[in-house]
Design a protein with these regions (language model features):
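N-terminal juxtamembrane cytosolic/stromal segments of multi-pass membrane proteins
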Residues: 34-67
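Selected alpha-helical membrane-embedding segments in polytopic membrane proteins
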Residues: 65-162
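Alpha-helical membrane-inserting segments
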Residues: 80-84, 114-118, 122, 184-188, ...
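Non-cytosolic membrane-interface motifs at loop->transmembrane helix junctions
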Residues: 94-100, 158-171, 200, 225-234
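Hydrophobic cores of alpha-helical transmembrane segments in multi-pass inner/ER membrane proteins
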Residues: 106-116, 175-184, 236-247
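Membrane-proximal helix-loop-helix units in multi-pass membrane proteins
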Residues: 144-199
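Hydrophobic alpha-helical transmembrane segments in multi-pass integral membrane proteins
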Residues: 145-153, 211-222
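Hydrophobic alpha-helical membrane segments
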Residues: 177-178, 200-216
Length: 253
């Protein structure tokens, strides 16, 4: 390897090293020594990334930071719903009805599953689209529920059941309530070293919006799956798209 190529490889490795040093995720084989030596011939960039991916300490620190930020942000979101919107008056009765419980389970499921996938994507060397299977499964369940509701709802009532009385409010409040959870997740993911920042940020947006939607559902009185699969789904996807646009910069090395 000539001197120019060696210097270029060293600089690439050093930039990655500084990124990981900043988040206290130094790999166990001690590459500070490699940096001090100034010898870029000893390791290729691909080897460096594989070693980073094998280090479990980065994942552990990301999970801890995620919980530290997510728990208070969700608590604040819950307080906003409780004080600002109010919990629906018939909540005790609603909790006994499957259509109400299912929407909370679906939204919370999106949030929790997406959080797990986002943490995996925040580590280099992880497959991207292949890890989205669980989210696709939740989407299939939601669409099946929507088809069931369409079949069982009288034709004359389908339009009203879909539009409801509060879909504009829903489309505004879910993004507003999602802001803090999404910010907490993105902050935790910055400890990682994702090679797919847009996809990782999109999944992070799904996670934060899903959790916020589960909280918002405690206030929303629209119980038809035609309503909440449509409008909750659009609001969650909208937040995810905005997060992907922002995360392409926030999560890039």
């Amino acid at each position: 390897m000539n001197a120019t190529a060696g210097a270029e490889l060293f600089e690439r490795g050093r930039s990655v090293a500084l990124r990981i040093n900043r988040v206290r995720s130094i790999a166990p084989w001690g590459w500070k020594t490699w940096l001090r030596s100034g010898n870029g011939d000893g390791m290729k960039t691909e080897d460096l990334i594989r070693c980073m991916a094998a280090d479990t300490r980065q994942s552990q620190s990301s999970i801890a930071l995620l919980l530290k930020g997510l728990v208070p942000s969700l608590g604040f979101t819950m307080a906003m719903v409780w004080v600002g919107l109010g919990i629906r008056a018939d909540i005790a009765h609603a909790m006994m009805t499957p259509v109400f419980v299912i929407r909370i389970v679906l939204a919370a499921g999106v949030g929790l599953v997406a959080a797990r996938i986002a943490l995996l994507l925040s580590r280099p060397g992880r497959q991207g689209v292949a890890r989205l299977g669980p989210l696709a499964g939740i989407a299939v369940v939601a669409l099946a529920l929507m088809v069931w509701a369409c079949v069982t709802t009288p034709e004359a009532a389908r339009c009203m059941a879909t539009v409801g009385k509060s879909f504009p409010f829903c489309l505004v409040m879910i993004p507003v309530l999602s802001f803090l959870p999404v910010a907490a997740i993105l902050f935790a993911l910055r400890r990682g070293a994702t090679t797919m920042p847009v996809l990782t940020a999109f999944v992070a947006g799904l996670s934060g919006a899903g959790m916020a939607t589960a909280v918002y559902a405690l206030s929303c009185a629209e119980d038809s799956p035609l309503f909440y699969v449509t409008w909750y789904g659009l609001a969650i996807l909208g937040v995810a798209a905005l997060t992907a646009a922002a995360g392409s910069r926030l999560l890039r090395w």
